[in-house]
Amino acid sequence: LGALSNIPFFYLWIVKLWTIFAKMEIKKQGKMLEAGTLLPLMEAFYTIQGEGYHKGSAAYFIRVGGCDVGCHWCDVKESWNPNSHPPTTVDEIIKTAHKYSDTIVVTGGEPLMWNMEPLTEGLKSMGMKTHIETSGAYPLSGHWDWFCLSPKKNKLPTAEAFDRADELKMIIHNRDDFSFAEQQAQKVAPNCKLYLQPEWSKREKMMPLIVDYVMENTQWIVSLQTHKYLNIP
């Protein structure tokens, strides 16, 4: 009977120890996420780039979870909550990426919510080219061979992001977006590639306007989401 009476006490200690270890693991993960050695990985896949300057080229995409920019027309809203995606070590991400391509595109979500230094340093140490797709709303981190900036009205890019941009990709959802695009174009370097891309759900309405605009303003280039037409990721 004495041994049996100790069972509840034993289980209480097990629960208490489990709680302590769980809290320690959460704290450890938090520090690793902050350091960038762990990232909330939504998905990763090898495909053909569908948009902008590198469309038609093969690349391995790393989609990082987490975004608070909040575009109402976002086609990957499931990426917004970083807690919905498994924390994955940068070493594991790099090891898998190396099997597929020497061109890596980091996208989101908003990847610059996280420290990109460990990821890009690891990728580049293995000879891979690093591209990023970002709103530019967060401080820059990482080493990038190509920087695609896509500003959003509700959370504008930093000055550093405008200075770094190799490509400016403006999403056109309505007529007002043309003037917003021109405002953003004034902030990038003269050699930055300028793209106008219709928001997918408005493409039939906005594409004729974009074509006319580009024909009158030839510094701009039409960008299509060709991967959606090809039915690939």
Each language-model region and where it sits:
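Hydrophobic alpha-helical membrane-insertion segments
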Residues: 1-4
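Acidic-enriched, low-complexity/disordered segments with a strong bias for Aspartate over Glutamate
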Residues: 6, 68, 75, 91, ...
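Flexible, acidic/Gly-rich N-terminal and inter-domain linker regions that tether
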Residues: 6-65, 70-73, 216, 221, ...
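Conserved Radical SAM active-site core
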Residues: 35-46, 58-61, 65-144
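Conserved AdoMet/S-adenosylmethionine-binding subsite of the radical SAM
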Residues: 112-233
